[in-house]
A protein has these predicted regions:
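WD40 beta-propeller repeat blades
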Residues: 33-198
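Eukaryotic helix-linker segments that join adjacent hydrophobic helices
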Residues: 1-42, 50, 54
Length: 198
């Protein structure tokens, strides 16, 4: 069996136990009901290396890190604007957030402190971010003129400091490039195959 988490309009996070044989009927009973948020929950994200640890982000601009095994909220912290995307790094020691204020934030999930922040993309439509396996950060968003755009950033990986295409330590604000794509109106989805090296 394995567990799946769902975000909900009713301000809760629900954890479901999925049998090895798969879902064969409509599931109506969750195994854990996590209650903290005051507005709808839009993001749930399992920790990449710690068992039973789940992150949730709601429309109340709050983030909660849960121990799903006990149903306990381990840590809560607020962000200044609505969270549009969240992504753990590979060992779970950092979380990236993109917010409605156009900023990308690198947060320490042990204390909720914002370690670094920068403008992700200048457009008013939302941006998304993902950690790549090599430690770089890939973002998608829009220009001021609503042209789709992507960016590659180096948020503090000393292994790349001698490479011409990468910038020095702790500079999320320095993009490695922001090629404009086109004028399409739809959001770009982050597509990343984690087990392949970029």
């Amino acid at each position: 069996m394995f567990c799946a988490a769902s975000a909900s309009e009713d301000c809760t996070v629900k954890v479901w136990q999925i049998p090895d044989s798969g879902v064969t009927r409509t599931m109506t009973e969750c195994v854990v009901d996590l209650v903290f948020h005051q507005r709808r929950v839009g993001i749930v994200l399992w920790h990449p290396s710690a068992q039973n640890v789940l992150l949730s982000a709601g429309s109340d601009n709050n983030v909660c890190i849960w121990n799903v095994g006990t149903g306990e909220c381990l840590l809560t912290f607020g962000l200044p604007e609505l969270v549009l995307s969240a992504c753990w790094n590979w060992d779970g020691s950092e979380v990236l957030f993109t917010c409605k204020d156009k900023k990308i934030r690198r947060v320490d999930p042990r204390d909720g402190n914002v370690e670094e922040e920068a403008v992700a993309h200048e457009g008013s439509k939302g941006a998304q971010a993902v950690y790549l396996k090599n430690g770089l950060v890939f973002t998608t968003g829009f220009t001021k003129h609503s042209e789709r755009q992507y960016s590659l950033r180096a948020p503090g990986d000393d292994a790349f400091k001698n490479n011409l295409y990468f910038y020095q330590k702790h500079l999320l604000s320095r993009s490695l490039g922001r090629p404009d794509r086109d004028g399409g109106a739809g959001h770009q989805q982050r597509g990343h195959v984690p087990h392949l090296r970029p």
